[in-house]
């Protein structure tokens, strides 16, 4: 089956307006290898690039064969490329929200913040993601690539702006509850006026974080600045998750027009088992090409060796830019 558009990622590299690239899909399909190779290509083109892993099971250190932590780390041997592995969850102590100094001791303040945050499921991750995006944006990289967690977690990330909006409304309601409580126990909290001032400071921070998420959300929906690259393998479950991802991204109005299919087998006269599996894969490949006829569907051959280190990534980079068709039998 003939593909309608070029089956490479050249279109992504040639886009001069992109700022954010998300790479995602089912677990174990080669997301980290794909995102790391793409980051390498951009860095070599002269763009100051950072790749960030939001997957709790980090693989960037293994992929680049060097230690990578929670702060930007320069990749050895690749100019313009940095990487970091971050925890997508957050500790309330690290949110930098103002405390109610003079009215409650530190432990009580932390308990209050924890209560506020835990009252809205998912808002802790939303706040963490907002802080992360804001911090990375301030680093002035030309391009930010996210190596995301498996599909379900990624879709939660995309829903964070809605969580923040709903969460803020609930926190505002709790705020008035605390104000009423303060009026009944003024001896503990101090004067109502002073308590209100401190509460205003704390909720001003929350409002600021919501503004950050709103700004990020606007950028994510701007196809000139943001795109998503789906990664899968030619098997039913992976194909199913890819379609789910495409539908959800479309619902969130986030651009996706590239899919990388890894671990593709080609005919081999010396291996009957390989040929049998390749024929099984071809059924799904044909379906993918037909379903995504207006996408850049990149077919990546199964690699003989594990892709690890700079040399391995360079070879993978070349394949991302080299057109390949569906195997024929």
Curated annotation (Swiss-Prot):
Example of a GO cellular component annotation carried by this entry: GET complex
Q: What main location does UniProt list?
A: cytoplasm
What Pfam families does its record include? Answer: ArsA_ATPase (PF02374)
Where does the UniProt annotation locate this protein?
Answer: Cytoplasm; Endoplasmic reticulum
Per the Swiss-Prot or TrEMBL record, the active site comprises: 55
**Which key words tag this protein in UniProt?**
ATP-binding, Cytoplasm, Endoplasmic reticulum, Hydrolase, Metal-binding, Nucleotide-binding, Transport, Zinc
User: Which positions bind Zn(2+)?
Assistant: 271, 274
* Residues noted as binding ATP in the record, renumbered to the chain: 26-33, 235, 262
Q: What class of enzyme is it?
A: hydrolase
Instruction: Note whether Metal-binding occurs among the keywords.
Output: yes
SUPFAM superfamilies linked to this entry: P-loop containing nucleoside triphosphate hydrolases (SSF52540)
A GO term for molecular function? ATP hydrolysis activity
Q: Name one GO biological process term.
A: tail-anchored membrane protein insertion into ER membrane
Assembly, in brief, is: Homodimer.
Protein family per UniProt: Belongs to the arsA ATPase family.
Q: What does this protein do?
A: ATPase required for the post-translational delivery of tail-anchored (TA) proteins to the endoplasmic reticulum. Recognizes and selectively binds the transmembrane domain of TA proteins in the cytosol. This complex then targets to the endoplasmic reticulum by membrane-bound receptors, where the tail-anchored protein is released for insertion. This process is regulated by ATP binding and hydrolysis. ATP binding drives the homodimer towards the closed dimer state, facilitating recognition of newly synthesized TA membrane proteins. ATP hydrolysis is required for insertion.
Q: Could you identify this protein by its name?
A: ATPase ASNA1 homolog 1
